[in-house]
């Protein structure tokens, strides 16, 4: 016999599930894009939920495992999408910062156009104006860098303001360099070397402070733009050698000053952060220790108080127990004394009772002969009285019989099963209770019982 004979209709008609098809679907989902993956996973879940004949035993457990893995995978995909969306938001913020910087740069260019005309007039008057300006501004920058360092928030605001101020100055230098159209290749070579040195220094500084890249993206972007502007200014200064070299020197001095100030600010910020971390870490260690010590001290105090109270209560209980024992002993002693007194009194009473009984016995022994004599006399008197009574009754009966005979009363002898009622019917015509009572009074009967051969007097 096959195993199908032992299956019911449910098992015979249920749908089979092939895990291989599910595996192929998962592989195809991995190959396709994310939208198709979500659609296929939802379809697979809906197919599993819409089955009319769910599997049993091992196949059911396997399907549950597969659905659980699909659900966990969907959750991971959603989490990945959310993280990607957050990263894109951050990139948009960076783009917004770059756009804002570009707008500021355009504004600075417009301002520089207005200043260019005045600068051209200055160039006509004297070519050494740029050098004089560079030498006069350098001590001011040094004095600014040697001032007191503010807090981290103030430093960030200061950086932004200085970066915005440095842009118009670089534009001024650029225009001054382009305005000198006479210098040759010597100015170009010097400007290229200085720009390369500045760029190399900037790369080294960026590599040293790579841990603080997220906080200083705006400053780096400004430096890169300034370096590009410096290169363009150096290339454009092909005609003016002396004046162009002076403008490039001024630009390099300003960049050096800016880089030194940036490095000092970064070092100060790093030191402040490290000191804050040290202080915060030390306080984080101290606070739990102090809290634990306080908690342990409080527990010890309360525990000591509880132990003292417990010991005091024990001593009080012992005192009360001892006092109660003493009181019970006193009561027992008093009761024993009372019992002894009662026993002695009862013994005395018993002795007196025994003496009384002895006296009574002696009295009874003396009174017994007299009592027997009196009893004998009483018996004799009773016998005499009984004899006289019998004589009187006999005489009375005789007299009554004589009277009845004289008066003509009738007599009746009982035969067979006669009774007083039949006798009353026979002589009086009616067997009433009054007639029966007459017969009973005449014969001195107390009951209705009569016997055969008995003679009865029947009154008229």
UniProtKB/Swiss-Prot annotation:
Looking at the UniProt record for this protein, which Gene Ontology cellular component terms does it annotate, in alphabetical order?
plasma membrane
Chain segments carrying region Disordered: 1-277, 313-411
The record, for PROSITE patterns, names:
LYSM (PS51782)
Task: Kindly indicate whether the keyword Transmembrane belongs to this entry.
Answer: yes
Ranges of residues in domain LysM: 410-458
Mark the transmembrane ranges. Answer: 285-305
Which ranges are annotated Low complexity under compositional bias? 41-57, 177-192, 264-273, 364-411
| Bias (Basic and acidic residues) | 1-40, 74-128, 203-226, 313-359
Superkingdom as given in the UniProt entry: Bacteria
Membrane topology per the entry is: Single-pass membrane protein
UniProt keyword list: Cell membrane, Membrane, Transmembrane, Transmembrane helix
A Pfam family assignment:
LysM
Tell where it localizes.
Answer: Cell membrane
Q: Which NCBIfam families match?
A: elast_bind_EbpS
Q: What is this protein called?
A: Probable elastin-binding protein EbpS
The scientific name of the source species is Staphylococcus epidermidis (strain ATCC 35984 / DSM 28319 / BCRC 17069 / CCUG 31568 / BM 3577 / RP62A)
